[in-house]
């Protein structure tokens, strides 16, 4: 029986994970975020109303589901409290349904300030390649830097606010020197930061729980758990398009580390992928489009970041990069989203391989940035469809060409597609196989 399922993105994020998690949540008892921070926006449509969350797990919109923010997440205290307040205003039950790990590292204003300062200058200290990453400006990277450098403030530091203030002052001095001397930016007043912390600290402390112990006991009881990934596999710090990546592990392995459970407690991995490709920010994008079709995908797909509002770059479905995501996360099956956005196109393309500058055909995703810059997609062209897929709930009701497109994607990525999303609403899905019913 499947008890624990990891749900991750197979592209560069924005694949529609939130909607699918929201759809599957009624079948589980827990939803757990394990990496990233509030740079991960997930938008869910319920009864034609959009709800956008950045930090709180998607399961919060269902009564009786316990939502956990595990230790691998970098947590903004202010953002968490704001999201809790926003949910309460729309009558979502929050109390006793959101818990956090005391080992979460905190995102504080100096992380955001240094993040924005780095992005403003023409070159960045994040890499040695004289490039701008195109971050969300949420302070995620600097917060993870503090974590690795062993100077981060964590949730458990809130237990003693006097000690917290002393540590805060030292770290603020560290960052203010950089902000003023190197980036010529305004310093952060640690007194203001401390005032914010005093305001929210009690709320956070009351939500602390021993996450590994809680989930171990849940498994013993036979409860089902969704481990909710943020961003996408191609943004993984080790296996993504480095240096144009996020600062955490976005693969299924990140769940093990970020939560504090062993590999044997991962029963299934579901990969979410769009029927086309998108990317926000800078970095390699082999199948990127320009012109009318790019505009079509962006406009019809509403491809604007839920965190930054930035326009997403769009391109054809890239089977090479998705196969890479499947390989590095041991993905069992896939969910294909936004098939409805392709309705009306005369043709659709699938990138099945790359061709190098010297004519070599490449079937595996390169790690080297230089190799990625010098490849050309090898496409298969399939007929488009004029019929509508929006809202269809049975596979055999899809237009013939849409079915052919989906089947061909299954063939070239090498795993089955269990779920097909046919629209933004949580119930607009074709369920070929329910991964939680195995």
Swiss-Prot record:
Q: In which pathway does it act?
A: Purine metabolism; AMP biosynthesis via de novo pathway; AMP from IMP: step 1/2
Q: Upper lineage ranks?
A: Bacteria, Pseudomonadati, Pseudomonadota, Gammaproteobacteria, Enterobacterales
Coiled-coil region: none
Q: Which reaction does it catalyse?
A: IMP + L-aspartate + GTP = N(6)-(1,2-dicarboxyethyl)-AMP + GDP + phosphate + 2 H(+)
Q: EC class of this enzyme?
A: ligase
Subunit structure and binding partners: Homodimer.
Which sites bind Mg(2+)? 14, 41
Which keywords annotate this record?
Answer: Cytoplasm, GTP-binding, Ligase, Magnesium, Metal-binding, Nucleotide-binding, Purine biosynthesis
Q: Which cofactor does it need?
A: Mg(2+)
Species this protein is from: Blochmanniella floridana
Annotated function:
Plays an important role in the de novo pathway of purine nucleotide biosynthesis. Catalyzes the first committed step in the biosynthesis of AMP from IMP.
Q: Which sites bind substrate? A: 306-312
DNA repair keyword on record: no
Q: Does the keyword Nucleotide-binding apply?
A: yes
Q: What is this protein called?
A: Adenylosuccinate synthetase
What Gene Ontology cellular component terms go with this record?
Answer: cytoplasm
């Amino acid at each position: 029986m499947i008890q624990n399922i990891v749900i991750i993105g197979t592209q560069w994020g924005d694949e529609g994970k939130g909607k699918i998690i929201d759809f599957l949540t009624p079948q589980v008892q827990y939803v757990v975020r394990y990496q990233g921070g509030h740079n991960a926006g997930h938008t869910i449509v319920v009864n034609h109303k959009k709800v956008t969350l950045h930090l709180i797990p998607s399961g919060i919109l269902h009564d009786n589901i316990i939502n956990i923010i595990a230790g691998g997440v970098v947590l903004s205290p202010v953002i968490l409290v704001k999201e809790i307040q926003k949910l309460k205003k729309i009558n979502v039950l929050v109390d006793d349904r959101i818990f956090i790990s005391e080992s979460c590292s905190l995102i504080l204003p100096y992380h955001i300030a240094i993040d924005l300062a780095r992005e403003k200058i023409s070159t960045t200290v994040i890499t040695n390649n004289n490039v701008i990453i195109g971050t969300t400006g949420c302070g995620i990277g600097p917060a993870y830097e503090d974590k690795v450098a062993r100077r981060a403030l964590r949730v458990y530091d809130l237990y003693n606010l006097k000690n917290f203030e002393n540590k805060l002052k030292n770290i603020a001095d560290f960052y203010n020197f950089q902000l003023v001397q190197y980036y010529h930016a305004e310093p952060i007043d640690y007194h203001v930061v401390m005032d914010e912390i005093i305001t929210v600290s009690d709320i956070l402390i009351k939500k602390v729980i021993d996450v590994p112990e809680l989930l171990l006991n849940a498994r013993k009881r036979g409860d089902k758990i969704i481990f909710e990934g943020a961003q996408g596999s191609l943004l993984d710090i080790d296996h993504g398009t480095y240096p144009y990546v996020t600062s955490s592990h976005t693969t299924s392995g990140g769940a093990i580390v970020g939560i504090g459970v062993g590999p044997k407690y991962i029963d299934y991995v579901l990969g979410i992928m769009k029927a086309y490709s998108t990317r926000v920010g800078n970095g390699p994008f082999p199948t990127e489009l320009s012109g009318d079709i790019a505009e079509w995908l962006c406009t019809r797909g509403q491809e604007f970041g839920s965190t930054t509002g930035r326009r997403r770059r769009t391109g054809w479905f890239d089977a090479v990069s998705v196969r890479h995501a499947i390989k590095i996360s041991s993905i069992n099956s896939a969910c294909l989203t936004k098939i409805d956005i392709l309705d009306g196109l005369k043709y659709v393309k699938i990138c099945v391989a790359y061709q190098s500058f010297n004519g070599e055909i490449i079937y595996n995703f390169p790690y080297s940035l230089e190799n990625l810059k010098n490849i050309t997609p090898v496409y298969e062209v399939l007929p488009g469809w004029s019929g509508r897929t929006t809202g269809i709930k049975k596979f055999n009701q899809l237009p013939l060409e849409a079915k052919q497109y989906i089947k061909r994607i299954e063939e070239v990525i090498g795993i089955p597609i269990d779920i097909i999303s046919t629209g933004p609403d949580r119930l607009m899905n074709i369920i070929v196989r329910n991964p939680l019913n195995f």
